[in-house]
A protein has these predicted regions:
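Outer membrane beta-barrel
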Residues: 7-140, 166-170
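Surface-exposed strand-loop-strand hairpins of Gram-negative outer-membrane beta-barrel proteins
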Residues: 1-14, 145-152
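Loop-centered beta-sheet repeat module
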Residues: 137-171
Length: 171
């Protein structure tokens, strides 16, 4: 990454996270993660910030199905890797394919502040998983710089948006 192929390595790609997960009741999960990340650029973009922070309430959880709701800053169900893109061993490479997971505008696609409903239905031959979310996407300074919005009059303010994902996993 960066000048590592020309020299003896590089510290231009660094990630460190601190997460906490607490289950105050068998149906309730509180979880949060602070993340400091730098992918090229200067060290000023490595300040820690809230990656996700949520309250998860499972209304139904048994052998057949799981149904719940999450409130807070939630990872968007976008593509295969977005929800786990900051977990190194879930990535196929150091950086995800940039055609889908563009790191320069990652704040817009990564998380949103809002609510998500989720369902997991276990069938005889597989599992159906679905998520439906409503929230306000994050728009950090990386988005304004990448899209060169600081050169234009006005401002970029994200609006409420919806996102959904439906998956089937065969046994």
């Amino acid at each position: 990454f960066g000048p590592s192929s020309q020299d003896e390595g590089s510290f231009e790609f660094t990630e460190i996270g601190l997460n906490v997960s607490l289950r105050p009741h068998q149906d309730v999960l509180l979880a949060a993660q602070m993340l400091s990340r730098r992918a090229g650029g200067d060290s000023s973009d490595a300040y820690p910030k809230l990656d996700y922070g949520l309250i998860d309430y499972q209304m139904v959880s048994d052998q057949q199905r799981t149904f719940g709701i999450q409130l807070g800053r939630i990872k968007n169900p976008f593509g295969f890797y977005n929800q786990t893109r900051d977990v190194a061993f879930t990535r196929p490479s150091i950086l995800l394919p940039q055609s889908l997971y563009f790191d320069r505008t990652r704040s817009l696609a990564l998380t949103g502040d809002g609510v998500t409903l989720y369902l997991e239905e276990r069938l005889d031959n597989g599992v159906i998983r679905g998520q439906l979310g409503l929230g306000k996407p994050q728009a950090d300074k990386d988005l304004n710089q990448t899209l060169r919005l600081h050169r234009r009059p006005g401002s970029f303010e994200p609006q409420q948006s919806a996102i959904a994902q439906l998956r089937y996993e065969d046994d």
